[in-house]
Amino acid sequence: MDDVRINTAGFVIREKYLSAMEAFIDQPVVKVLKGMRRVGKSVLMRLLIGRLIDKGVPGANILYINKESLEFDALKDYLDLYRYARDYFQGGGGVGKKYILIDEIQEIASWERAVASFLADGLGDVVISGSNARLLSSELATLISGRYVEIPVYPLTFREFLTFRHPRTQENIATATATATATDAPGQTNASASTASTSTSTATDTDAEFSNYLKYGGLPGIHQLPVEDEVIFIYLNSILNTVLYKDVITRHKIRDASIFDMLVRYLFDNVGNITTAKKIADYFKSQRIRTSVDTILNYINYIEASLLIDKAPRYDIKGKRRLEFSDKVFLNDIGLRHGLIGYRESDINGLLENVVFKELQARG
């Protein structure tokens, strides 16, 4: 079970991921955080830096690069990255082990060459993050095969969602229960009744929060916003647009954005349903839109690579044989769906199936 707690600075710590990162610190492998945009990879890196400093690592021995910051906009390719890291440590690094942490590394052209050189030259222990599945597998596998570990980072599970929403809830419940146990004497029921009332109230609150979870999803950033549909859905839709246009349309040079947009809406509207490329192409044809099955397949692969969706393959039960192009599509974060097409209670079956799929995935 996930271990989520609050640190002294008030941040919610997702201990499962931090522990996975720490297990490989000072080992000769690249630590790769893989997850969709805004899932919390940057916060995990900052928390890891905090733990390194707590263990006595000088701040000068830690280089943190976030490619979403204009501060590092000049780092365009692998040579820029390598020279920047080399000069940083030559100019002021302290004695001892060095650490290089790079966020959204896919924004640096041929970055894998710099990472391979960091390893070869012993420049520092490397932790990277990225939000594109293809970049973080094929390119890494080519240059540093056997010298990296992938740590997938998922949106919040429901348990994590509760912790973000009510950081002290579990602590308060434990305190109430302990107080009831200590003050209850034989024949006295006031404390027990109080505990029962607390439990009933908590169950009611949990039901309400699960409804919020189904509607808003598990991206950590929503917990900095008012719990209002209009506000949260605008935020989620802005994230979705960034992913679609920056990570998919621009990167893959998609020419017909209108067909691509329709495909995204179709996939989001059919979460949990068995989907085939031919079925989608036939639907488009019924709407007087001409496109090919191959185009649909390519677009779905691009969307999957951006980590917006997961495909659950269907198998022939008798022969354990995978049936081609007959998958169920699930969303990495269900809230993004509602930012795009709105929330409908009539879709509850697919939404619940999506939540269960992601919970099982997060548990490994």
Segment roles from a protein language model:
Residues 33:
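Hydrophobic anchor at the beta1->P-loop junction of P-loop NTPases
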Residues 54-69:
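Conserved catalytic segments around the Walker B and adjacent sensor/switch elements
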Residues 61, 228-364:
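Accessory nucleic acid-recognition modules appended to NTPase machines
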Residues 65-96:
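Short glycine-rich substrate-engagement loop in P-loop NTPases that contacts/grips substrate
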Residues 131-133, 138-274, 307:
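Interdomain motor-coupling "hinge/lid" segment immediately C-terminal to the ATP-binding subdomain
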